[in-house]
């Protein structure tokens, strides 16, 4: 905050019962989140001024489990965690963060969008039960220069997957350095009516696990984002220090934030790839045999946990020409 940050995160990236189970600290999860939010809020209030208010984002990490990827090569249908397991854990975390008086919620470092959706669903449940709402930020992570998340989604597919939620912002953090992140930030910027955030690492870690990009190096790279009108929110992830934040704040003061584009209303779908249906699109084939309400066979396969055969039904639909499966 003293370096010039407008928003600070709570120290709760791993603040779920799922992540804390590795340390036998499940019973401490409420206190971890509540106290972290409370302390951060007290400091933010202390440093805030009428001209520059400061805000606290409740940090919600991806957990150390994935709902979309099997850890067993020999059993692709196996999962360490279910959607409901994640939803319940995230709900506990969100309740504690809100009780600690955070100003917004940040679902960050998303490598599996299904995990993210569980967090967003949990947030919506808590909002309804507590009759309170705060802004929601979502930040994914592109694993490498293939341009995909760990679960295989492109940047646009990731955007489409969460755009049903009225987010404050969407963006990327971690994993890549600033320059490598640029094309994916631009893609979000061009195709989203949400604010865009970017808080990359200080480059990639070296052989000693340390980060080499200085505040000046990162500042020049992020200045390109600002000068090009790509972002509304900037910051730093792994390897960044108060010196980095001070440099970002100094540079950001010179530029206007990105203008929100007005986009045409279109059907936007996503799997691992994005599909946008436009007036110019050819006929869109939808395969409906993977619908438990429309196919007795598929419903039986799902009830019997025969996911290998269920997958073959989906594959047959795609090979028969379906661009979308229902």
Task: Please provide the spans of the model-predicted regions.
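Domain-level signal for soluble alpha/beta catalytic cores
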Residues: 1-326
């Amino acid at each position: 905050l003293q370096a010039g940050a407008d928003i600070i995160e709570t120290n709760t990236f791993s603040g779920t019962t799922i992540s804390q189970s590795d340390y036998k600290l499940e019973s401490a999860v409420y206190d971890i989140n509540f106290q972290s939010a409370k302390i951060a809020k007290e400091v933010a209030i202390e440093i805030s001024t009428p001209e520059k208010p400061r805000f606290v984002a409740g940090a919600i990490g991806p957990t150390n489990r994935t709902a979309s990827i099997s850890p067993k090569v020999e059993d692709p249908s196996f999962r360490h965690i279910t959607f409901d397991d994640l939803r319940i854990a995230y709900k506990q975390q969100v309740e504690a963060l809100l009780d600690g008086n955070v100003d917004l919620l940040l679902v960050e470092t998303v490598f599996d969008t299904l995990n993210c959706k569980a967090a967003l669903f949990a947030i919506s449940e808590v909002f309804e039960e507590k009759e309170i709402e705060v802004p929601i930020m979502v930040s994914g992570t592109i694993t490498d220069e293939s341009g995909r998340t760990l679960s295989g989604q492109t940047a646009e597919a990731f955007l489409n997957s969460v755009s049903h939620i009225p987010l404050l912002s969407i963006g990327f953090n971690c994993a890549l350095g600033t320059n490598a992140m640029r094309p994916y930030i631009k893609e979000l910027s061009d195709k989203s009516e949400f604010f865009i955030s970017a808080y990359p690492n200080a480059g990639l870690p070296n052989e000693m696990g340390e980060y080499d990009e200085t505040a000046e190096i990162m500042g020049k790279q992020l200045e390109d984002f600002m000068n090009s009108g790509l972002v509304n929110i900037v910051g730093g992830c792994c390897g960044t220090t108060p010196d980095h934040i001070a440099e970002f704040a100094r540079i950001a003061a010179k530029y206007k934030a990105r203008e929100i584009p007005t986009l045409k209303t279109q059907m936007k779908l996503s799997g691992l790839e994005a599909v946008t249906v436009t007036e110019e699109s050819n006929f869109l084939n939808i395969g409906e045999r993977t619908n438990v309400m429309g196919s007795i066979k598929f419903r039986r396969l799902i009830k019997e946990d025969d996911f290998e055969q269920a997958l073959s039904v989906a594959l047959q639909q795609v090979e028969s020409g379906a661009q979308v499966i229902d």
